[in-house]
């Protein structure tokens, strides 16, 4: 099982959301279109700009992603996450 932590602000600041399962709509957790940094503690994850695991996606492996540029995305656009 993997774990990903999403943060509202760059450099791991603001509100955070810890997940261990895929989420097709981050709005359920109040995290739609606000993610600005990510820590992947374990597993491989795909993050998507649109809900329902659609739109542009980015593959993330364990590590720290302090800003959207570090995963190749744009600020405040993520809407779903899927564990591989």
Swiss-Prot record:
Residues 2-42, 43-84 form the Beta/gamma crystallin 'Greek key' domain. PROSITE patterns: CRYSTALLIN_BETA_GAMMA. Residues 64-84 are annotated as: Disordered. Keywords: Repeat. Disulfide bonds: none annotated. It holds the Pfam family Crystall. Palps of larvae and otolith of the light-sensing ocellus. It comes from the Eukaryota. InterPro entries: Beta/Gamma-Crystallin (IPR050252), Beta/gamma_crystallin (IPR001064), G_crystallin-like (IPR011024). Monomer. Has a single-domain beta-structure, folded into two very similar Greek key motifs. PANTHER family: BETA/GAMMA CRYSTALLIN, VOLTAGE-GATED HYDROGEN CHANNEL 1. Belongs to the beta/gamma-crystallin family. Structural component of the neuroectodermal visual system. This is Beta/gamma-crystallin. The gene is Ci-bg-crystallin.
